[in-house]
């Protein structure tokens, strides 16, 4: 267990360093790089905090060593084995009362194992709370909601974005703002208040663009980073910046093919929805 925790600590240090560097460079990257590239950069950090990439680098073995180096290592190994045998004989011939039993290393090992199990338990609690709150959230949204089938504007936007998969559309009183949920069985929830057709079209473009980009998968991966590195404050900063970059990237993708007037209308629609959500909280 402690070996796994050591790997996690290394990943955590790498991720913290990369996050700190990106936050320091953020004023520059926001001006120089488009939104999708900023999003991709944060994705790289997330991957580096989950996958120990150095384990995939091939290590040199005895076949790749020079003959002198290989002979040297073999001789050193033989010397270590002989020394171990001599030490064993000395220990066996030493009276019991004069033997020194090394217990410090054993105690340290127990402490390290305890820390590793504490980390594992914290990760379990984090995931339990995260999944529990998520399922309660879904139940609240689904309770009392109504599914809209073959909704014309929704289907039109799906065709515009070349989305063929069936995505359900539901109206919910518990939805403070439009949202896409469900990685395997996607559903778009919209508030129950009446909206004009153009506003609905902009909302559907936003949520379906999230689906097309696979943003839900990325957010689940960011949640996994939070769970594994729950002790690292930079993991929470990373998660917040991932969410921000995700929304900005989605907005830029939506307005890319819109006229200037439509872009203004879209941004005003998003700002109005954000204000409505804040008031409901």
Language model segments and positions:
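Membrane-embedded and juxtamembrane structural elements of multi-pass membrane proteins
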Residues: 2-71, 100-281
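Low-complexity, acidic polar-rich segments
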Residues: 73-108
